[in-house]
Amino acid sequence: MVIEEVMGRSTQGKTEPFIWRGDDGETYYVKGAGAGRRSLICEWVAAQLATDFGLPIAEYAIADVPDALIALGVRTDLRKDLGSGLVFASRLLPHAQELTPTTRELVPDDVAIDVLVFDWWLKNEDRHLTDSGGNPNLLWDTSGEKLAVIDHNLAFDPDFNVENFLESHVFAHLWNRVFGDHIVRLAYKTKMIQVLNRLETVRASIPNSWWWVDEGVPAQITWDAISACLDRCRRDDFWDIS
């Protein structure tokens, strides 16, 4: 997909993605240079894994921002915060709103538990929601009355904090439904291992340019780190919260 027209920039989220129209006529949130190479890799890898895992993730793609579009200078922040070349694009859902404590109650438990386990697997601590607020990085699509999963830029976190995860994750209240049931845990282990069968295909799909911040300067994540995080699901201590 090629990006054709800039429509604005989001003021929400740490990366403040740009809003663009693609050559398919659809509108996307787009993350590029400003988000960081690590972020792009995490988004792309996690999005594909989420699809294979069965999560209701918003449609996504790798998009190309032409040099000529940046050169037009329609926004002063495009060159620094987006840049030309390959970027990560997530389709805008026109009838979606950020998940709240109220709409959280509408999410089916099986879907919520899937999200919880997936975030545990990917060490994604960035999905907070308590009665006092938070940033769940989840949307409620009012047109279809369903959940939409977005934002995995902080996945594969080397500083993942188990205590914080279990206290503030949007679906943490369902943890014991998994942790306390051996059959459920075994089913999820089987599911995760099946997803891992496509891991080399996922790796091959990552643009080579994303592995480098600059000439000779690697991105702040390695494939070995991603693979090690995901391979935890094979270990007996995968569910250990101590």
Language model regions located:
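Active-site-proximal flexible loops/turns
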Residues: 38, 133, 158
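Short, motif-level signal for alpha-helix interfacial/capping segments enriched in acidic residues
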Residues: 97-107, 130-131
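Solvent-exposed, non-transmembrane amphipathic alpha-helical segments
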Residues: 69-70, 77, 138, 158, ...
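C-terminal catalytic region of ATP-dependent kinase domains
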Residues: 141, 145-242
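Conserved catalytic core of the tyrosine transesterase superfamily
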Residues: 109-112
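Conserved ATP-binding subdomain of kinase catalytic cores across diverse folds
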Residues: 1-101, 115-125, 143-145, 155
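Catalytic-loop signature of eukaryotic-like protein kinases
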Residues: 124, 129-140
